[in-house]
Amino acid sequence: MEKPRPTIEDRGPGEPALAIVGGIHGDEPSGVRAVKRLLDADLSLQRGVRFVVANPPAVEAGERYLDKDLNRVFPGDPDSSDREERLAARLCAATDGLPTLSIHSTHSHSEPIALASPEYPEAFRLAAQLPTPYVVDETPAVDGAFTACSTIVTLEAGCQHTDEAAATAERQARAFLAVTGALDTPAPAADPSFYRMDIPVEKPPAESYSLQVANFEPVSEGVVYASTPTEDSSLNGRSFRSSYRSVATRRSSGIRDQSSAIRSPKR
């Protein structure tokens, strides 16, 4: 049975005290590029840092995943017959107890977004210190994500396959290193808004789709927030209307959810 393993490189003094992870999804190269750039930069690290490329076969193939979505099977099972289940278990073990930044990218949103679970207060505190405009608790709407594994901060760095997303990923990773004391540089200013994902709205079965509203903007009851194409590829085939006042978001796997703002000044 194949034993898939993440690619791991430890840098800095002593045992690893934190981790930076890219490549959970193989079609999101910004995190992998950020990891490689940081390794090539030969940083003067003040603490041990574990750099990880999570899913090398998917990265090499340029595919989101090969068999199962890795970011939906955590914490995984080391004895499972499914390769992603085994890989998830190894990734959890490699980052166990380490504050971790996991870097992703999206199809739609160019601004960075931090996601963390309040079940891990340290992760939520770290997310709030990153220079991102939004911090999102996705726990109620997403099962099996890496954020549920430990002290994990997920970063959506921007649009997939763009140089801007790779540059943002590196900047945010450097900010994470500064916030955690691994780099002896001032941490950048942060003042995010906080959101919580509440109700999952599955992506409709279609080759393509259109989000009709802006990310993180309020959606009034009755407003069309998304549509799918007809056979002639127009974007009026099927419309989806909000049944309540909410905030719509879209992530790389499609139109996923509606979110409600939570007001919390806590860091």
Specify the residue positions occupied by each region the protein language model found.
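Structured catalytic-domain cores with a bias toward divalent-metal coordination
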Residues: M1-R267
